[in-house]
Swiss-Prot record:
It comes from Tetradesmus obliquus. One of the primary rRNA binding proteins, it binds directly to 16S rRNA central domain where it helps coordinate assembly of the platform of the 30S subunit. The gene is rps8. GO terms for cellular component: chloroplast; ribonucleoprotein complex; ribosome. This is Small ribosomal subunit protein uS8c. Keywords: Chloroplast, Plastid, Ribonucleoprotein, Ribosomal protein, RNA-binding, rRNA-binding. One of its GO terms (biological process) is translation. Part of the 30S ribosomal subunit. One of its GO terms (molecular function) is rRNA binding. Belongs to the universal ribosomal protein uS8 family. It is found in: Plastid, Chloroplast.
Length: 136
């Protein structure tokens, strides 16, 4: 049993995108499902669905074609993922102090009283919360 399901999810996504996999299986939790919805809405993954028989989320990656001098290569839309608030050290912020990731190119995912939100949504609603992770 994994204690930190969010870190496990981010690690699985990072490892699968580094080896250019098309899909990755992630254990289903409501939190992982909400994070996957945000990743899909923000354009970091192509789609996701729940595999009923194994209780796993299947994430389909989105890749960009990158031309080099001699070939075309696939480059993941996800450059990096970083867990910020950890079980041993929780990081909280209010709505005025929510940091920007790469000048707005990346996103923060926050757990707020309204639900799981991106940094832009939290600023617009004027709510703060626990900073779960950053993605760019």
């Amino acid at each position: 049993m994994v204690n930190d399901t969010i870190s496990d999810m981010l690690t699985r996504i990072r490892n699968a995108s580094m080896v250019k996999k098309s899909t990755v299986l992630i254990p289903f939790t409501k939190m992982n499902q909400k994070i996957a919805q945000i990743l899909e809405k923000e354009g970091f993954i192509q789609s996701f669905f729940l595999e009923e028989d194994s209780k796993m989320l299947v994430l389909k990656f989105k890749y960009r074609s990158k031309k080099t001098s001699n070939a075309k290569t696939k480059e993941s839309c996800i450059t990096n993922l970083k867990r910020i608030s950890k079980p041993g050290l929780r990081i909280y912020t209010n709505s005025q102090d929510i940091p920007r990731v790469l000048g707005g190119a990346g996103i923060l995912i926050l757990s707020t009283s309204v639900g799981i939100l991106t940094d832009r949504e939290a600023r617009a609603l004027g709510v703060g919360g626990e900073i779960l992770c950053s993605i760019w």
